[in-house]
Amino acid sequence: IGINTGLLTYAENEAELAAVLSHEIAHLDQHHYLRAQESQQQDQWLYLGTLLASIVLAAHSTDNDAGLALGLSTQAAMIDKQLRYSRLQESEADHIGMQTLVSAGFNAQAMADFFKKMDQQARIVGLMPEFLLTHPLTQDRIADSTLRAQQLHTKGELNSLDYQLARTRLMAILYAKDHNQQLQHYQQQL
């Protein structure tokens, strides 16, 4: 799991950072990457078989479109299967990640809060059609994680002074042009 400065500055509190890490740990714990690779290897033979069939059909048919249609529809079905599988894994990682988040003593609402930020950012950039997404719709993730947080009735930690100090220092280093600007930034954060 990699953590970069973008995540550290985007996560406004320690619980949001913990929510992201809990989600990623769930992927590892559930062997999602290995299972996805195994699924793709199994599907590879089906794909190659139908590709071969489409070539044979195109070669022995007066209508070349039939072979092309078979090849393209197989490819579309394989991509759809991979995307649906990916979305299921993401939902599973959200659920298990929230349990990890709560077990670690953090407020479960932090996961929904982070998804809200992602949703706001996506609206600025532009939304992709749902059928092209590798993750569930962010609005669905917000609704699900908000409901689960309410059901868990957690009042865990959102933040710590150490996290805020580290985050403030990082942002000052990243965005300040000189030491006076850094000092002003620190004073504003207090």
Label for each model-derived stretch:
Residues 28, 55-62, 120-127:
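Secretory-pathway/luminal and periplasmic proteins that interact with or process carbohydrate-rich
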Residues 2-19, 81-88:
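Short pre-active-site segment immediately N-terminal to the catalytic Zn-binding motif
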Residues 45-60, 65, 69-79:
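Membrane-active amphipathic alpha-helices enriched in small hydrophobic residues
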Residues 1-12, 124, 142, 147:
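Signal peptide-directed extracytoplasmic domains
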Residues 6-8, 25, 31-34, 120, ...:
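Solvent-exposed coil/turn segments that connect beta secondary-structure elements
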Residues 15, 25-42, 60:
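Catalytic Zn2+-binding segment of zinc metalloproteases
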Residues 38-45, 66-69, 105-115:
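Acidic/histidine metal-binding catalytic segments
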Residues 76-190:
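Extracytoplasmic and endomembrane cell-envelope/extracellular-matrix remodeling and assembly machinery
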